[in-house]
């Protein structure tokens, strides 16, 4: 049996086949997020989760696992009928409408750009530095 490999040779060849991506080949840096941008609204399930967390904590005060709460909530959500989900869907829809209104106002504000009256801190300090230079002499003298 020429060319047959032993078990250890087979294992080592399988291990050597796996390749790791080169450094820097991953995702690029994410763009800086604007802290003033409105947050996206919660889905009906997450609105349900807000209520469910409170009741679950009361029933299971010793539970510290987030995964357990999430799993229990998911199971409960799946077991609910459409009529039982309706109030959560309505709340989510209401939040979505409010979000759309806020995002339109936010985008409109972005399109307008900064107002001319407002100056950035940097430009104000540059103006003050120029004023200071005009008031004093060109060269600073030591009083020693």
Curated annotation (Swiss-Prot):
Entry's induction text? Up-regulated by cold stress, but down-regulated by drought and salt stress.
UniProt GO MF annotations: chromatin binding; DNA binding; DNA-binding transcription factor activity; structural constituent of chromatin
> What is any Pfam family matched here?
HMG_box
| Acidic residues composition bias: residue spans | 127-144
For this protein, the record's InterPro entries field holds: HMG_box_dom, HMG_box_dom_sf, HMGB_plant
- Keywords assigned by UniProt, alphabetized: Cytoplasm, DNA-binding, Nucleus, Phosphoprotein
Expression sites by tissue: Mostly expressed in cotyledons, hypocotyls, leaves, and flowers (excluding pedicels), also present in roots and stems.
Compartment(s): Nucleus; Cytoplasm, Cytosol
Residues recorded with modification Phosphoserine? 125
Q: Which domain of life is it from?
A: Eukaryota
Annotated DNA-binding residue span(s) = 38-107
Coarse class of the primary localization is nucleus
Provide a GO biological process annotation. Answer: chromatin organization
**Disordered as annotated region, ranges:** 1-42, 57-94, 106-144
Q: Which GO terms describe its cellular component?
A: chromatin; cytosol; nucleus
Q: Where is the composition biased (Basic and acidic residues)?
A: 1-12, 73-94
Q: Which Gene3D superfamilies match?
A: High mobility group box domain
Q: Which family does it belong to?
A: Belongs to the HMGB family.
Its function, per the record, reads: Binds preferentially double-stranded DNA. Confers sensitivity to salt and drought stresses.
Q: What is this protein called?
A: High mobility group B protein 2
Q: Which organism is it from?
A: Arabidopsis thaliana (Mouse-ear cress)
- Per UniProt, what is the name of the gene that codes for the protein in this document? HMGB2
